[in-house]
Regions:
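FAD-site-proximal beta/loop scaffold in flavoenzymes
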Residues: 1-9, 103-151, 161
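Glycine-rich dinucleotide-binding loop and its adjacent helix/turn
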Residues: 1-22, 26-34, 125-129
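Phosphate-coordination loops involved in phosphoryl transfer and adenosine-cofactor binding
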Residues: 11-13, 68, 136
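Cofactor-binding loop segments of dinucleotide-utilizing enzymes, especially the Rossmann-like FAD-
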Residues: 20, 43, 144
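A conserved FAD-binding loop/helix module that cradles the flavin
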Residues: 25-29, 142-171
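A Rossmann-like FAD-binding core segment of flavoenzymes
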Residues: 32-129, 170-171
Length: 171
């Protein structure tokens, strides 16, 4: 689930955030204002995030964390009911109604790199944001590979814009 898109659906419910970096820290802080309980489940041995996030998390009263966890399964019939994981080989179960995965991601830009398209310093495809065109005339890009919000809704809009631009390019 998307924290900002779906977080409000979990008002006064227990949720889990699976992750380890700034994204997980921001998700915990955001959800702590909505959910009854926020449990961070991390494969790392500690939360590695900006100090300002770590300080704010320390003051939360509805937060708990489990580190060094290996996620085994998310269970539920029609809705999420629990997260199953292992810590040091010991199986554990946590009852939650929502799960937000914040493990970080890196879009696959291999084809763009192979084509020789210009890339940003962050490793994304460099585009003209007005028409989604890349550094190669007639080649357009959209979605996570171009950076930005990393949201499905914005990717759909950018994809539509890229499609229209491609049609205009083709005449």
């Amino acid at each position: 689930y998307c924290v900002h898109c779906d977080g409000a659906l979990y008002r006064n419910k227990a949720v889990a955030v699976i992750g380890y970096g700034n994204g997980a820290a921001r998700a915990v802080l955001y959800l702590a204002n909505i959910a009854s309980r926020v449990h961070l489940i991390s494969p790392k041995e500690k939360l590695v995030a900006e100090p300002v996030y770590l300080e704010r998390i320390k003051s939360l009263t509805n937060y708990a964390a489990t580190f060094g966890a290996q996620i085994a399964e998310i269970r539920g019939e029609e809705f999420v009911e629990s997260v199953e994981f292992n810590v040091g080989g010991t199986p554990r179960s946590l009852k939650v109604e929502g799960v937000f995965v914040e493990m970080g991601m890196k879009p696959n830009v291999e084809l763009a790199e192979n084509l020789g398209l210009d890339m940003t310093s962050g490793g994304f495809v460099k585009i003209n944001r007005l028409n989604q065109e890349t550094s190669m005339p007639g080649v357009f890009a959209a979605g996570d590979m171009t950076g930005g919000r990393m949201q499905a809704a914005t990717a759909v809009g950018a994809g539509a814009s890229a499609g229209i631009s491609a049609l205009q390019y083709l005449g």
